Amino acid sequence: MTTHVTLEDALSNVDLLEELPLPDQQPCIEPPPSSIMYQANFDTNFEDRNAFVTGIARYIEQATVHSSMNEMLEEGQEYAVMLYTWRSCSRAIPQVKCNEQPNRVEIYEKTVEVLEPEVTKLMKFMYFQRKAIERFCNEVKRLCHTERRKDFVSEAYLLTLGKFINMFAVLDELKNMKCSVKNDHSAYKRAAQFLRKMADPQSIQESQNLSMFLANHNRITQCLHQQLEVIPGYEELLADIVNICVDYYENKMYLTPSEKHMLLKVMGFGLYLMDGNVSNIYKLDAKKRINLSKIDKFFKQLQVVPLFGDMQIELARYIETSAHYEENKSKWTCTQSSISPQYNICEQMVQIRDDHIRFISELARYSNSEVVTGSGLDSQKSDEEYRELFDLALRGLQLLSKWSAHVMEVYSWKLVHPTDKFCNKDCPGTAEEYERATRYNYTSEEKFAFVEVIAMVKGLQVLMGRMESVFNQAIRNTIYAALQDFAQSSLREPLRQAVRKKKNVLISVLQAIRKTVCDWEAGREPPNDPCLRGEKDPKGGFDINVPRRAVGPSSTQLYMVRTMLESLIADKSGSKKTLRSSLDGPIVQAIEEFHKQSFFFTHLLNFSEALQQCCDLSQLWFREFFLELTMGRRIQFPIEMSMPWILTDHILETKEPSMMEYVLYPLDLYNDSAYYALTKFKKQFLYDEIEAEVNLCFDQFVYKLSDQIFAYYKAMSGSVLLDKRFRAECKNYGVIIPYPPSNRYETLLKQRHVQLLGRSIDLNRLITQRISAAMYKSLDQAISRFESEDLTSIVELEWLLDINRLTHRLLSKHLTLDSFDAMFREANHNVSAPYGRNTLHVFWELNFDFLPNYCYNGSTNRFVRTAIPFTQEPQRDKPANVQPYYLYGSKPLNIAYSHIYSSYRNFVGPPHFKTICRLLGYQGIAVVMEELLKIVKSLLQGTVLQYVKTLIEVMPKICRLPRHEYGSPGILEFFHHQLKDIIEYAELKTDVFQSLREVGNAILFCLLIEQALSQEEVCDLLHAAPFQNILPRVYIKEGERLEVRMKRLEAKYAPLHLVPLIERLGTPQQIAIAREGDLLTKERLCCGLSMFEVILTRIRSYLQDPIWRGPPPTNGVMHVDECVELHRLWSAMQFVYCIPVGTNEFTAEQCFGDGLNWAGCAIIVLLGQQRRFDLFDFCYHLLKVQRQDGKDEIIKNVPLKKMADRIRKYQILNNEIFAVLNKYMKSVESDSSTVEHVRCFQPPIHQSLATTC
């Protein structure tokens, strides 16, 4: 039966798809996210103690005491948190400045309203510390009673008392440190007294007591000391507590860093409490009751330990403030000022790395079989296999704890020993205390060591977290097997002996242990067990099947078993003879071994919590102690002083490749701190501050990382594209242009879901956004750089674009960027506009700089800047100063490319024209050509036309070519006289030639652009040939057939033939595009299209004024001697610029280049006057005569021979120009006029015949 689903349900189901996790191949370079699952806590705090009625009643009672003491320790922890996280309220409240202030009552009322709940907490704290001291002293008094001094006291009980000692030390130090607490209470007290809130004597007395309690330093310690000293034998119990801490510390009977540091603090504070008026620790040491030398060694190895948050304690201070220190100072080495090797983390790194590699290798072996293959929970393992996994889990936790403790210990030592400007030259004298303790207190090597250790801790946490279910299974199986084997099997022999020897007390303890923990196969103890009767097992043995289950003991059950086992092997007992003496040596050894191993059972049963605690580095962020020291000057410290950001920023600033993959691990310290602030401190404001810092730091992180990645790939592209010969030549001269060192950004670029403060951040997307912006800015900067320079810089623009294109290609392997063409169009402002910034600037440069200021040299085929500019160089905007990576990638690359580019800077030639063709494309070139034609039109129909009209007027009306008999000197003098007005025309060599130069340069630009465009098109055609099935003819041997070889070649390249491929696989639109592209590529060169022909035709249309051709000839054919046509005027101009100049003068070619001749010759050709010019040119006639007579005289200050040489050079140049122009014009004429127009003239008749006729 089909079910109907509504549209709303369907849409909601689709929305739910977004929440499905999609596993990817993202490299794991960050710590594990907080588990969504609940963390089960099976610690009942002995609430189920009454269920174990079979246990020894004394230990059940002791469990009751434990329970109440643990509750008091939890309450003490809450007050420690309250004190540590206390922020001054009174500083934020307006102060009453004088008694006459009108709103003082309102201020005082608000002060009381705000501070009363806080003062109530302080009052409760004072009562609590009294109650805690009283409770502790009562326990000490009870245990030190004369009748109970020889009673057995369990290690767990002694450790609980040790935790009390630690709590007193911590609370007292916190109370001493917090001046803001005293200030807030004073402000409240002042306001309350004014408002008469405390009228009754009891309230006044309590307030006074609180004031004294807060004001007196070490008040808790003093009260505790005073009350302990009146208890007889208290030092014996404290000695037991200190000794158990020494033993635990020495044998590494701790797991978490906090447990390790607690043992040391209890040793130190315990010694301080023991050393007083009543007892002397040095006498106790002499009696071997305690071992001061061992404690001294511990304190020398670890001089500073964390006290609470960022508060640290120097352990030697407990010794130095003890009563009998001065006379026994020589016995202590820990009080001497020396740095322990423990704090040199760089030297420790060799061992840490070795431990890490060994453990990771072993863990990977299990991980591959358990997690990757999925056989972890399904397969049943042997006890040995479970034991191996159990040991592996324990060793992993111990390693993590060791590394975390090491980091915290070095950090603590640095906080206690801040640097200064003498120790660190980078540290300014005005640096704050916290800044000197964090920002300037670590060398680069120490920061890297910190990062590496943190990465090891967090990385191993990930691996062990993945195997949590496997470890938990193995832990429960192993603990169950160990307990059951020990209780059901190992304890049979001592029970048999105890029954046989009738040791009732021992029997009761052993039976209590078995009844407390045993899980019998049949549900009850076998009644026929011979050991219960003290008998030997039968010869075949008594078969006891111990079951196997994955069930661990409860916390109370484990406590009862361990305590009862401990009572069997303890040196103390309530009776004269200890129970230990009733047991055999091997049994005692077995019990001791089991008791030692079972110490870690509690931690391992709570594996998830233990793993989190062993990896907790949250205290690296908290700074309440140092904030308190600023006395309100700082609300919070900047990120530059925050350890997580210091470490992260150090990696980013140094760009160390080996550390780059660790960059996310320091940021996880914020996760630790935020978790601690919410779950342990339970302070929202601390979390808010962490979150605010994370927001700022992560923005900075993405900003810096994105810039680094872009700079790296830009430098890589610049290095790849740098000319190899140039690099080799630099190397020969000792200049090394390095490649950027390989870095590991790829792993970071694959991060799609970075976990930070519960957020899943797509780092790849954020980096993509910034790099897209950087790429756009880089392209914009390249174009802006081109816009700020002349036309020669277009070569540099292409290089910059090529480097950016390669950068884009490299980055696109990891990031989803827009296409390069789209980015370039956007930067070029060419998205919707028909032409972009490049095209506009090319035309702008052509119009305002290139045409008026460049001279063309036909020999080199280059334009160079004129020696004498006739126009001012245009003003260009300077490009903005940017980082080197926005140009070529780095400073060395910028210098290298600048040197290469300098060879293209002083001319405009074929490289520049090819670049213009590639960058502007057909559309851009068409725009530029159109605008150039407008300039040429305005010149030919404006300035040039006016000058032509003026010069035609000053030309001689008739100027015949003199006969050869006059000789070249005479002819020169004749022409000089005839053209005197032209020669002396002031504006001829300036404005007239300048205008013609601009026309000539424009024509030349069009010609050279077409030549460059043709080369580019040929290149495109050759590249496209294999994809268009255009194959070269192959070489064939004798006897071979060409058709067969060609068919074989066509078959080989058939997969590359694009059009059939698209026709078979593409859409109709794609097929149409492919066909059109194929047709365009094939036909654009085959058609023989010529742009320059069109240009010349358009220019010819601008020469419509009659002045260009002159009036109709009187003879009806042509003007011979009359100077009315343009070619005669150009002959006169040519005569002028052929006259040699003086020594320090510039020639016409230096000032105007060949562009001047191109303009004149082009106009002559377009007017159809080339042959007349060749026949009637004044200079050519002079050259012809001079070549015949070979004379060399100076006529009118003009050296004849030099002038003839110049004429010859220009004649050659003119012929070349005419040849080029005629090549294009003849094709035009042949196309336009297929019929040749012939005009017939009557033959000439002699005058004598004419008269006769």
Curated annotation (Swiss-Prot):
Signal peptide annotation: none
Pfam families linked: CYRIA-B_Rac1-bd, FragX_IP
Keyword set includes Cytoplasm: yes
GO cellular component: cytoplasm; neuron projection; synapse
Subcellular location: Cytoplasm
InterPro entries the record matches: CYRIA/CYRIB_Rac1-bd, Cytoplasmic_FMR1-int
Protein family according to the UniProt entry: Belongs to the CYFIP family.
Name of the protein in its database record: Cytoplasmic FMR1-interacting protein 2
Annotated organism of origin: Xenopus laevis
Gene that encodes it: cyfip2
